[in-house]
Amino acid sequence: MIGHNSGRTRQKKVRHEFGFWSIVVIVLLVLAAIFIVYPFAKLFYQSFFPKGGTFSLSNYAKFFSKKYYMVGLRNSMLICVCTTILGTLIGIPMAYISTRFNIWGKRIINMAVVLSMLSPPFIGAYSWILLLGRAGFITKLLEKIGIEIGSIYGFQGILLVFTLKLFPYVYMYVSTALKNFDSSLEEASESLGVHGFKRILHVTLPVIMPTILSAALIVFMTSLADFGTPMLIG
């Protein structure tokens, strides 16, 4: 009798665990495999096996022998690395100030950050052209008072737009990590004589470093995948 009841309990547990959301997850994984994994796998396979069907590195030799491709790859990597560094340097202090101090307009800042993340790349880049382009509003306004600014077109413009567009990812991730931070660690460091910036450097940042690295990776990959901004401003 006891064995029968325990078997029935296990069956109910299995049915409970393999419920609606389990089916949803399986369906999503299948769709991801069909529409994401399969195309990339096929593309990767065909890069080594051209139309003839024999193994060859000719595609890679052609890519790395063309100066045009190498310059584009180098510039893309440079933009992504610089954007990641600047976005991290802006996002972390903003997140710390926002979570540790009761500043005026905190909700407005958070709302503006979230809204900036929702705008498509083309819209964001075009907005900056309207502001800082050759005939941009801010450009013309500064020219009237005798101030000339550099062109937004080119490397510096792409870096500016990418940084201001993507640092909110770091801000949001780090803000969440700091809100969930165990305050007893900071209190313990204070009692041991670790104060101010030294406490941030040796206590706070090491604890939230996985979050910072995750946010930096998202910034890097997003800037690498963004084609609209370089096309308009580059």
Question: Language-model features: where?
Answer:
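Hydrophobic positions on the alpha-helical face of helix-turn-helix-like DNA-binding modules
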Residues: 188-189, 199, 203
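Transmembrane alpha-helical segments of polytopic membrane transport and secretion proteins
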Residues: 1-28
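Helix-turn-helix DNA-binding elements, focusing on the entry/boundary residues of the two helices
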Residues: 185
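A short amphipathic helical element positioned immediately N-terminal to and/or at the very start
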Residues: 11, 56-64
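Glycine/proline-centered hinge or cleavage motifs at structural transition points of membrane proteins
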Residues: 192-194, 206
